[in-house]
Amino acid sequence: MAVAGVALALLGSCGGMTDQEKAMIGKYYISAVSDTHPLLELGEDNKAVVRAIRPGELSFSVEGVWHVRNDSLVIDNDVSSIAIEEGDPSLVGTVAEHVGWPIKHYDETTLRIERAGIIYDYHRRMN
């Protein structure tokens, strides 16, 4: 009985969000790309939505699960969840099932990450 209790406690401690992840929950925008749709949504229970937008051509989103691991934002995308919001679906191309982006800086309003050698500032809105 005690062994079962310890096992349940260990399983429970593996789940949930870290304090850092809880602090990062929100919708993140790059206003040069879109002021109306967040490019990154980091939700409760580690649910994520990543949006790709090429203004006037294509906009789509994919759902996934996110975590912060080793100072990186890691997202496991569910590629079956791709939703076309605007444009031709044949333009989507390949969506990565797993991404990891180094976090360069984080505060209450800005998440700075590195993607393919380029630094991006995502601005969080509390809406």
Positions of predicted regions on the chain:
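Sec-dependent bacterial lipoprotein signal peptides
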Residues: 1-12
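Lipid interaction determinants
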Residues: 14-127
